[in-house]
Amino acid sequence: MADLSCNVGGIKSPNPFWLASAPPTDKLYNVERAFRAGWGGVVWKTLGIDPPIVNVSSRYGAVHYNGQRMMGFNNVELITDRPLEVNLQEIKQVKKDWPDRAVVVSLMVPCNEKDWKYIINKIVDTGCDGVELNFGCPHGMSERGMGAAVGQVPEYVEMVTRWVKESTDLPCLVKLTPNVTDIRKVAHAAKAGGGDGVALINTVNSIVSVDLDQMAPEPTIDGKGSHGGYCGPAVKPIALHMVTEISKDPETQNLPISAIGGISNWRDAAEFIAMGASGVQVCTAAMHYGFKIVDDMIDGLNNWMDEKGYATLED
């Protein structure tokens, strides 16, 4: 049987399948269910500074294609709407109970040194394995000068990453937005700032459909709608291309990559790993089919690696 253990920028896990920062990783109950199902790691739902934001409902939409609603998934979800201290306590408990699993904390705060160093100092005592800097969210938070508003400016990416690395020895993954002209420039900036790896892609800025009765983008809330983040199987080709661009670029070819975007089965994961990823993150498929899909992912990747004669993911 192949060895599926992985190391993404100094963050180790028993297999390469992590749950991405999203509703499935927003609380202790969900994360414990995920670990019992077999996931190798989680990226905790993005934390910010209190007071918490308010998430609206409904906040999800989908692309209709040949009778299938899940070709693409759209959301206007923001960061966590739970108090910071509650999240910190639960992260500490999860890591205590599951020491062999990767627990990475996603972070997003206003783009100033004081707030970034404040949030880093708050999470270091949780025992988490690393942090993921959310520079990718294209909606809601970007209008507040966070998320993709930072990730679209390489100078900001380098600056904030450096602030974080000056404040902690924890491994730091920089989550990149696909809503840029050249993903390589942003990856260069993440590396220059001291980032230990990159995670990509975050969601694609989108409007998936329009409610022709209310004349507003879907999903609508009280008759109003907005652009959101597009994910799911439809974005996989975009993600594969951007992962490949970074892994083959001479300046970043050895930079660890946590690949995200439309990964629904072991074959998708194998494709990203073949193109240079050290591990993968899953969200939409887990929301659609449930946490136990990781069983087939682990078995499928194991069987394929055995068949091809690969002993480790590095092979």
Question: Each predicted region: which residue ranges?
Answer:
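N-terminal capping/small domains of soluble enzymes
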Residues: 1-104, 108-113, 117, 297, ...
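Short catalytic-loop micro-motif centered on adjacent basic/acidic residues
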Residues: 18-20, 103-106, 172-176, 258-259, ...
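Active-site metal-binding loops of divalent metal-dependent hydrolases
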Residues: 22-23, 261-263
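Alpha/beta enzyme core
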Residues: 32-37, 41, 110-258, 267-277
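Short secondary-structure boundary segments
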Residues: 45-47, 135, 202, 284-285
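C-terminal helical cap(s) of enzyme catalytic domains, especially alpha/beta-barrels
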Residues: 52-69, 209-227, 285-310
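Helical hairpin unit composed of two closely spaced alpha helices linked by a short loop
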Residues: 259-262, 281-289
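Mid-to-C-terminal alpha-helical segments outside catalytic/metal-binding sites
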Residues: 311-315
